[in-house]
């Protein structure tokens, strides 16, 4: 009898996995069937990151530190400040299938499936119930905010963060309150989160600390918990030291242009707009469309109705959820926070990554209190159909977008939030279009106007000879570097080349095949003495021995966990 039940459970699991595969790719096919990508807030940034990695791999190099094939080809250290580990699958798919639109949607489909797998098995471990895990996975997969991130904003990094968050919160709960031996999963989850999205990592870390402090009196063995959390932190450091060392060393040694600081009181959501978008389940309209979806409102109403039946654990989730929602709105005193570290958020609604998970956990519990015939099946059907309908509405709403072509100023159009759609032919128009100054080195003594002026000179590939400007004759990208061909110079001159230098010891410069001494000017551009003739200059970023060692430590740590330790667990 046990064997029969075991076989039935295994068969049922296979059916569920097949269902997850179907919804993962069918939900994206609804959008992808026209052969277009639709413009999102972060599409330029992420397309450039993927294409940089593609070109790096195609040129037989494994790691991209600076952008030389994309992002204006001026050596911006995007991948030092914004980890790209999770983009390798997208890059490999892009290389294998050639069609960029198909490969990106295929990558997003795999991300969908990963979200299902992590959600299902972590919630199964948390609740001990297969059916609850299935319900939670459907709620989480079709959650409105996740789809806003995925297809409306094209924020791949935050979507990956959303995918791994159930693992983190489950491992945190187990480590602190139930099974202390699960600390290793906490370390792995936090490492995967850091490699996905630094801001999400900071938000999640902050909330874990808050939850830990709120529930300090519920720890049954404080010393053991502290020991296990310390072990998790140490393993986390081993897994991420390859990124953290280079990131911190570069960040602390120079001043960089941070992502734009915004007025939080202006980017916070108005309550009325949030409510309207919630009732509309809106993922497709321009403007203030950020919301948690109609299901979140239904779950909150049911939570209030069944409040007396809930344990203190779920009551706490209700209050945390309400706090997150209010935190994202103008009801929170954001004008008082403008001079604090909270400006790193840029948009208060980023906290919805927490609220989204909380409402799905709460919804799974609450829907279990509704005792109606076939309600379990009906609730799954409603969640699925509502999700698919909303995704289709996005497609219908954006199908009339203007086609991007070579004559379109892609960056300007996207900056003005114009609606565009991109096919395989026009995809290349996105690559040279990123004029974003984020992560470029800056001199705080220079005015904003002057810094912008110099940046525009640099991205147009002009050399600075005192007050004169000369266009580079030819530019060829190589992995983590470029080869420049200069025009003929009338006399021996000191020249600032259109290429950013972060830490001087990391760069090698060859002029006409010979190693050349160089300096760095006040704009952090490569400064060099050139003779009165044409020159071929190769500039390349070379990681230090310490950087290589830290990367190897992280690779070996992941390998040990993946091939030796985790199979035993």
Regions found by a protein language model. Name each.
Residues 12-52, 234-244, 387-393:
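Transmembrane signal-anchor helices characteristic of membrane glycosylation enzymes that use polyprenol
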Residues 9, 449-569:
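Active-site-proximal, structured, solvent-exposed surfaces of multi-pass membrane proteins
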Residues 1-31, 560-569:
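Start-transfer (signal-anchor) and selected internal transmembrane alpha helices
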Residues 26-122, 126, 131-164:
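Active-site lumenal/periplasmic loops and adjacent helix-entry segments of GT-C-fold
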Residues 222-245, 317-323, 383-384:
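Hydrophobic alpha-helical membrane-interfacial segments at the cytosolic entry of transmembrane helices
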Residues 368-393:
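Signature aromatic-anchored transmembrane alpha helix within multi-pass, membrane-resident enzymes
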Residues 20-24, 79, 107-126, 130-176, ...:
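Membrane-embedded helix bundles of polyisoprenyl
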Residues 228-229, 233-304, 421-427, 432-437:
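Periplasmic/ER-lumenal interhelical loops and adjacent helix-loop junctions
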């Amino acid at each position: 009898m046990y064997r029969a039940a075991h076989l039935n459970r295994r068969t049922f699991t296979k059916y569920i996995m097949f269902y997850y595969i179907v919804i993962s790719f069918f939900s994206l096919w609804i959008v992808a069937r026209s052969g277009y990508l639709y413009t999102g807030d972060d599409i330029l940034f992420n397309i450039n990151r993927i294409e940089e990695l593609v070109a790096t791999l195609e040129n037989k190099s494994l790691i991209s530190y600076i952008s030389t094939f994309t992002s204006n080809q001026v050596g911006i250290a995007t991948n030092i400040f914004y980890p790209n580990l999770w983009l390798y699958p997208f890059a490999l798919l892009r290389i294998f299938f050639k069609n960029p639109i198909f490969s990106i949607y295929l990558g997003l489909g795999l991300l969908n499936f990963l979200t299902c797998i992590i959600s299902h098995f972590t919630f199964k471990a948390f609740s001990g119930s297969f059916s609850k895990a299935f319900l939670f996975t459907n709620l989480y997969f079709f959650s409105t905010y996740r789809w806003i991130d995925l297809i409306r904003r094209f924020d791949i990094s935050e979507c990956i963060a959303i995918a791994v968050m159930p693992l983190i919160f489950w491992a945190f709960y187990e480590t602190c309150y139930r099974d202390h031996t699960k600390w290793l999963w906490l370390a792995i989850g936090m490492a995967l989160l850091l490699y996905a999205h630094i801001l999400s990592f900071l938000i999640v870390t902050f909330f874990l600390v808050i939850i830990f402090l709120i529930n300090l009196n519920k720890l049954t063995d404080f010393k053991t918990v502290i020991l296990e959390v310390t072990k998790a932190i140490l393993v986390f450091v081993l897994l991420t030291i390859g990124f953290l060392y280079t990131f911190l060393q570069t960040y602390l040694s120079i001043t960089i242009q941070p992502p734009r600081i915004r007025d939080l009181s202006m980017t916070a959501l108005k309550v009325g707009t949030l409510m309207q978008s919630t009732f509309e389940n809106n993922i497709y309209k321009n403007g203030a469309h950020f919301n948690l979806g109609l299901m979140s409102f239904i779950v909150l109403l049911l939570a209030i109705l069944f409040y007396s039946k809930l344990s203190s654990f779920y009551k706490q989730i209700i209050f945390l959820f309400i706090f997150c929602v209010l935190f994202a709105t103008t009801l929170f005193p954001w004008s008082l926070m403008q001079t604090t570290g909270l400006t790193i958020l840029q948009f208060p609604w980023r906290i919805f990554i927490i609220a989204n998970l909380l409402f799905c956990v709460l919804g799974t519990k609450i829907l279990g209190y509704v005792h109606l015939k076939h309600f379990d099946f009906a609730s799954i059907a409603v969640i699925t159909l509502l999700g698919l309908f909303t995704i289709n509405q996005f497609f219908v709403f954006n199908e009339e977008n203007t086609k991007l072509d070579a004559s379109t100023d892609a960056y300007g159009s996207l900056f003005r939030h114009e609606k565009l759609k991109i096919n395989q032919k026009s995809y290349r128009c996105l690559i040279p279009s990123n004029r974003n100054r984020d992560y470029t080195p800056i001199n705080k003594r220079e005015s904003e106007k002057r810094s912008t002026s110099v940046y525009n000179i640099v991205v147009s590939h002009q050399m600075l000879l005192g007050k004169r400007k000369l266009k580079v004759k030819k530019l060829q990208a190589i992995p983590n570097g470029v080869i420049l061909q200069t025009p003929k110079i009338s006399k021996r001159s000191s020249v600032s080349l259109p290429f950013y230098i972060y830490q001087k010891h990391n760069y090698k410069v060859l002029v006409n095949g010979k190693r050349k001494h160089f300096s760095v000017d006040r704009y952090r551009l490569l400064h060099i003495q050139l003779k009165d003739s044409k020159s071929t200059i190769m500039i390349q970023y070379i990681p230090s021995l310490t950087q290589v060692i830290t990367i190897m430590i992280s690779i070996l740590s992941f390998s040990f966990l993946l091939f030796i330790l985790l199979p035993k667990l």
